[in-house]
Amino acid sequence: MAALGLLLQAAAACGSAGPLRLGRCYRGARGLCTRLAEPDGLEGARQEDEEEQPPPPGAEEQSTAMVKDSRDLLKEFPQPKNLLNSVIGRALGISHARDKLVYIHTNGPRKKKVTLHIKWPKNVEVEGYGTKKIDAERQAAAAACQLFKGWGLLGPRNELFDAAKYRLLADQLGCPDERWCSEGKWRSKSGPSLADLSTCWRRMEPDDPIQPMEQGRMPKAMRREELEEGELEEGELEEGELEEEAIDVSDYLPMAHQDARTPGRDASRGGSSIEMTDDNTAIRALTQFPLPKNLLAQVIQIATSSSTVKEYMQFRTVGTKTKICKLTLRWPCPMTFAAKGRRKVEAENKAAALACQKLKSLGLVDKNNNPLSHAMYNMTSLRELGENQRKPCHIKVPEATLRKIENYLNHYPVDIRESRPRIADDMMNLSKESGAISDAITGKTYIPMLEAEEVRLSQNLLALWKRRGSSWQESHPLPVDPHKDTILSAIEQNPVVVIAGDTGCGKTTRIPQLLLEHYILEGRGARCNVVITQPRRISAISVAQRVAQELGPNMRKNVGYQVRLESKPPARGGALLFCTVGILLRKLQGNPSLEGVSHVVVDEVHERDVNTDFLLILLKGIQKLNPDLRLVLMSATGDNQRFSHYFGGCPVVKVPGFMYPVKEYYLEEILAKLGRHRHRHYEIKQSDDECVLDLDLITDLVLQIDAHGEPGGILCFLPGWQEIKGVQQRLLEMLGSQNSRYLVLPVHSNIPMMDQQNIFQRPPPGVRKIVLATNIAETSITINDIVHVVDSGTHKEERYDLKTKVSCLETVWVSKSNVVQRRGRAGRCQSGFAYHLFPRSRLDKMPTYQVPEILRTPLENLVVQAKIHMPEKTAVEFLSKALDSPDIKAVDEAVILLQEIGVLDQREALTTLGKRLAQISTDPRLAKAIVLASIYRCLHPLLVIVSCLTRDPFSSSLQNRAEVDKAKAVLSRESGSDHLAFVRAVAGWEEVLRRRDSRARDNYLQDYYLYGPSLRFINGLVKQFSENLYEAFLVSSPSDCTMPSSVCNQYSEEEELVKGVLMAGLYPNLIQVRQGKVTRQGKFKPNSYAYRTKAGTVLLHKSTINREASKLYSRWLTYFMAVKSNGGVFVRDSSQVHPLAVLLMTDTDIHVRDDGWRATVSLTDSDLLVLEGDSYTIRLLRDFRVSLSKMVETCLCYEMAAIPGDLHHQHSQLLDILVDLLKGPPGSFGA
């Protein structure tokens, strides 16, 4: 620390001199280097001489002491880039610190080097090294955090201070004068904010010609800045890193002062030559501007975006006793000022004060004598750009295409209404009208069992049961077994029973068996048909397999499961069917009263997921239709009395569990075990709700448990897939050649069930099993050999922002009940250990239970489901019956959106479109895109896109995001579409599968960073959606959907049409791209893009290829997924779409303004699209749009296979013309 003190003293000594230039570099032991620099203005020869000198004695030892091992630094500062951003952001009142932290990358043969330029509170450089760019950046940032801590800018536990304290600390450090350029938030009074400019001015040649600045020309420094910014954007942004807050030029202009004078008005009239002025005038000017040289330098730096002022202002001083200074300015036009003084500095200050006086008269300094913002200095360019952006996009349609449109409209006038059969309602309700209902167990048509058949089947079941020998229950007793009679009696006597069973009591596997056994032994086994819901696919399958095993080979066929894309149902009559909640909801559409079902068991009801809460509403109503149905709610933890009260005070049967003792450790003890300091980021964030994981700490803890802990499996709870893969990769790297001694197994819904069976198997002797799982392993699955539980204390939770209408999947702290569940996983089979990676004080702040999902998610899909099951009720009426009713405003917003996209009418009834898409099991907007694709005959690519938006095909992780983005860009080619990249990725996968070459298959996955299990799942989704389309009468056969030769795929190769159909389904998810933006600090960026939606400004996430697009061919993007993070809304997937697709294919109203020669057309619900053209073209496009709309309406009223031949031919002509239109140029960008 003594060496660190020397370093800080040196920094403080240099700080008052202004910006620091690179000086000597002493390398630390672990590849980190901190450089203190020398004041700007020293001669180059002096620098060269110093660099030739050997390091002072002990310098290497001081450096080694000063710079810790990089690993220790990263443990002390686990998220260093975020921490630096937060300190500077809070100190300066800015949303990002990009201008104050510049990362310069140098690629070495084996290692990456990063030089971090820190421009606040002092100009200092630090270096970092790593095998990857992000590692080098993090090392450099950690070294910078160490400096900040030494300067007192961080608390003992790395906590932040308030802005006022940072200003005080900055004054003490003598830091540069920082302010919000346009708002004048605060000024440092501790000294000059720029270097002593006299040295560099003295070195300038006085006779250099001074040229005026060209109006509208951006200086060279702007290009340099953009390069640095580009380097920043190329690097990996850490999770949570702040994004720049900015507004587009058109929004900024009305906020700027209309009378603001700019260089383009007064200053550009020509230069002025000012002779020696009266000394009193100069003194008055100096009184008005006490630090004139600083102010001049600041104004010029801000206005010109230059890092140096040498080329814009020169001082030339002559004389002996009386010094005469001539100041020549090149900006805003050539001007010369002269003043005298007894000393050189006095003369220079007077001349500079006169220059400041002149700038203020030109309106280039504000009333408080502070610089204006960069945008205000560039108002001329800004206004020109704003005017350019406001111009409509000019559309010119080829004459040949116009003739085709004209001929079509002459042959099929838009004012002639087609006669459409009124068959839509009949068609969509065929099964109900015929009286046919589906069997909830088998999925086939339900036929009640005859009494004789029932008796015979019951006798067979009894015989099978008696032949099974000793039961599994007898040899493997569980805590629930002694309560068998109490449970069965309660279920027999009450329509609803709540079973509150502690973790490990056996309720999930045993109670369904108890019900089946009870009915069989009473001779009515054929009447026992139990549907058991599980919240997740993996638990439905694994529990079914476990129960089948326990029942033995004679009864195994009576147990089955059904999840999305996987089904193995049992025969009806003495059946146990395990399924997900979504599957049961689907079954209720075909069997609303659950005829033929004896019991519904809802397991894990305490998790309060949105589907379970919705199911409870329906089950409450079904009891009136089917009084014989028995409902069993099973809960591990939670407020069980609430469930009882919801169902009219039904009984609650409590079943105590058995758990071996579990020794618990919290963060304080864990850090002590690892020999670490307590000031971890968990404690930094302790006062906030935010939680950020330290994957290195988790990895180290797992290795510590392996080295010193008891034998047995380790279960690590992590919030999501990225964290699972991050810890898995770290473990495999650390274990190295010893990998064979470990079984590292991820558990996640992204992984197919067949790839996760190993988690239930005991590993061979000498092999340690390490399971990395989300909260899926809390209650849904049981891994019997777990001894150690590592609890991160976090999980992913979806939250919906009503204001921005955007969902956010956030990492949040779990509840106390979650902590209890996780701890219980360690004591199932023997004494265990639980390691909680949060302080005990955090446990006290955790909520008792989770917030129900229905209160924090978008409700559109739920409203559609409500209309299917109870169409006579309004959405608010239906959802008010929930255990926890969602906000009425949230329900109303969902209804409004569904009305906007044409799913509901004004009476809240399902439209013809709504009835079709209700058959498709996905988000309503994606379902709409699928329905439209069947009409526009480009179905297969849309099925692939929707499937990939449901399950990402790329093998993305925190470490390989950049490579995945590059692979996606390659697949996208020139389409400007993430969605078409999905289509090409899946098409390539199908091609290599057809070759039956395993090496080619593996190479393809590796080359494009694709994940095989996800691609298999996507293939299954495509098949499921094909079945849905068949059920909705939109295709003749499910196989038509994937056949290139089928009618529904006639235009599947037309990329602009595919993107247009996707946009039509997702609308109003439309982005207008505008060139030029102004940051919150007033920085004008003419070459940057701003992105506007109907709801407001958004940002493009790094995962979309259009974020890095150097040139967009269209000003319009469509998207599906937007997430809220760090106060901004980020779009993760996007496609550039043709403006004519937006005009012609959306189902919103349009407005046409026609003067008889030129016409403009715009959307009435937003200002995102304004097109112009000649009147004739616009009128033809308007009528053509009506024809397309009528085609969609007509097709929705027909069974697609039964559309008459003349209509089919007419629609083919229409689609041919549309394809031609979309092949035309999209119009000039910004013109």
Curated annotation (Swiss-Prot):
Subcellular location: Cytoplasm; Mitochondrion; Mitochondrion matrix, Mitochondrion nucleoid
Gene Ontology cellular component terms for the protein in this record: cytoplasm; mitochondrial nucleoid; mitochondrion; nucleus
Catalytic activity: ATP + H2O = ADP + phosphate + H(+)
Chain ranges of the Helicase ATP-binding domain: 488-656
Keywords attached to this entry: ATP-binding, Cytoplasm, Helicase, Hydrolase, Mitochondrion, Mitochondrion nucleoid, Nucleotide-binding, Repeat, Ribosome biogenesis, RNA-binding
Keyword Transit peptide listed: no
Residue stretches making up the DRBM domain: 80-148, 292-359
Coiled-coil region: none
Keyword Coiled coil carried by entry: no
EC identifiers of the protein: 3.6.4.13
Residue span(s) of domain Helicase C-terminal: 697-870
Single GO term (MF): RNA binding
Positions contributing to ATP binding: 501-508
Segments for region (Disordered): 39-65
GO biological process, alphabetically ordered: central nervous system development; ribosome biogenesis
Protein family according to the UniProt entry: Belongs to the DEAD box helicase family. DEAH subfamily.
Function statement: RNA-dependent helicase. Plays an important role in the assembly of the mitochondrial large ribosomal subunit. Required for optimal function of the zinc-finger antiviral protein ZC3HAV1. Associates with mitochondrial DNA. Involved in nervous system development and differentiation through its involvement in the up-regulation of a number of genes which are required for neurogenesis, including GSC, NCAM1, neurogenin, and NEUROD.
Descriptive protein name: ATP-dependent RNA helicase DHX30
Gene field: DHX30
